[in-house]
Design a protein with these regions (language model features):
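A compositional signature for long Ser/Thr(±Pro)-rich, low-complexity
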Residues: 1-344
Length: 344
């Protein structure tokens, strides 16, 4: 766990609207465990911030879950793209109280899974999308990547969607929770640089245009998979939900001097990474979902509680968030309430 900021404390985001007040109600770990075991697990796909969200789930659900892989034999760490899972702990007192579906295997069926995917697609797929945008013109590079590209971790949606839709006992996922935008930069995708302005940094509009097309292709693909017939036991494809969590930029300057929450979201005053573009990218993903018109794909604008919390960052930087600050914990609570609403 990353060291906490010395003035950081847990803060709860409580909605003011009477209609949304219930989303501020606390959710016990027992309620979360019951939902994950009986109604279906959560599959988290994204970058290092999503990985932190996964880690926070292990804390929220302790001692009722066992996390894998075991990093101890590997010196305490491993490849960043290793699959990570939370399984129901056989010694949990809740085991005898739960009623999981037929076919659920306590040793094989994850409650929560994380896969590191920075750019939604694997490189060859993203290259194909980019070339199709330009009608395979010779004026654009053959690849967005290349030897000068910064490191990113990627996986084809064919792979992670096949995991998401797999039947029991291998899987029983109800929710696919996806968030992306932070690695969509000219560092990760140097082939997207404007040839007339190759020095342009992460805010190059060509990256944004590629992102807009990529999320359009992605939402269409995901919607198609959800319409496919289900195989085997478990949550049916028609019952699954794909939730796009608004991506979260960091805070400018020295966030570690902040002593508490802000009263309003600060506008960016300079070009830090691609942070000033994140809002537009979130809106692009939201628009792609709306255009698809599939009620199983939904956009969750959960970024504001974190945008108001520059004090909640870990000491390492002003992007990653301290476990226990209330941000990730609030996301889990909101998603639980959201899924309960859909069941009502």
């Amino acid at each position: 766990m990353t060291p906490a900021h010395p003035t950081e404390t847990t803060q709860d985001w409580i909605p003011k609207s009477p209609v949304c007040m219930m989303y501020g109600e606390q959710v016990s770990r027992e309620q979360l465990i019951r939902a994950l075991a009986e109604q279906g697990g959560w599959f988290l796909v994204g970058n290092s911030v999503t990985e932190q969200h996964f880690f926070s789930m292990s804390c929220l659900l302790y001692p009722h879950v066992i996390a894998t892989p075991d990093y101890a034999p590997h010196g305490g760490s491993g490849p960043r793209d290793w699959p990570q899972n939370l399984y129901l702990n056989p010694s949990s007192p809740l085991v005898d109280q739960l009623k999981p579906p037929a076919g659920f295997d306590i040793k094989r069926t994850p409650l929560v899974t994380f896969r590191r995917v920075d750019l939604l697609f694997e490189p060859s797929e993203l290259d194909a999308i980019h070339l199709s945008m330009h009608n395979s013109s010779d004026s654009v590079p053959s690849t967005l990547f290349g030897p000068e590209a910064s490191e990113s971790y990627n996986l084809s949606p064919d792979k992670y969607l096949s995991i998401f839709t797999a039947p029991l006992p291998e899987a029983n996922y109800k929710v696919l929770l996806v968030s992306t935008a932070g690695h969509w930069t000219t560092a990760s995708l140097p082939g997207a640089r404007d040839p007339s302005d190759v020095q342009k940094e992460a805010t190059n509009p060509a990256v944004y245009k590629t992102f807009v097309e990529a999320v359009r292709v992605w939402t269409k693909k995901v919607s198609g998979v959800l319409k496919e017939p289900s195989v085997g036991q478990g949550v049916k494809n028609s019952e699954k939900q794909v939730l796009i969590r608004a991506y979260l930029p960091g805070h400018e300057f020295d966030c570690h001097k902040e002593t508490g929450p802000l009263t309003r979201v600060r506008e960016f005053t300079r070009e830090w990474y691609n942070w000033s573009w994140i809002g537009r990218m979130n809106e692009a993903f939201k628009a792609a979902i709306q255009a698809q018109g599939n009620p199983q794909l939904r956009f969750l604008g959960l970024d504001k509680p974190a945008l108001l919390r520059p004090d909640a960052h870990s000491l390492s930087d002003c992007l990653h968030i301290q476990i226990g600050a209330g941000i990730f914990e609030g996301w889990a609570r909101y998603i639980w309430h959201f899924m309960e609403d859909l069941r009502a």
